[in-house]
Amino acid sequence: MENRPNVLFVTLDSVRHDHTSVHGYERDTTPSLRRIADRPDGATFDSCIAHGKHTPKSSASILTGIYPSVHRFGYEDNTLDPDIETIAERFSKAGYRTVCVSNNAFVSEETGFGRGFDDIVVVPKEPLDIIQTAG
């Protein structure tokens, strides 16, 4: 078995960078993310910029690494061009097991955002439902 790192890729939608404790906010707003980032093998990125003002276009850019004007998601329709590779597809081709845990309806096979994930777990938006789903 190959010795390679586990990769946990976390994105947050509609969250202010300067209001997260992982980035120094005085209130402990993101304790779990801070613990992960503070590990010797943890990392955070301070220069991440949304490439669209709407979640779908930004999410497409995050998952593909290309600008909305190139991937065109959300312009004509809400389907990612099958010729555009996602980060999950790249990890899958490299032999990683890929799992997406999301409450975002756009992460699906129908939109193309789900391509490359071995499993997609849809997490409910209500806290009690999240506990029941995880349990």
Each model region followed by its residue ranges:
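Catalytic domains that recognize anionic headgroups
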Residues: 1-135
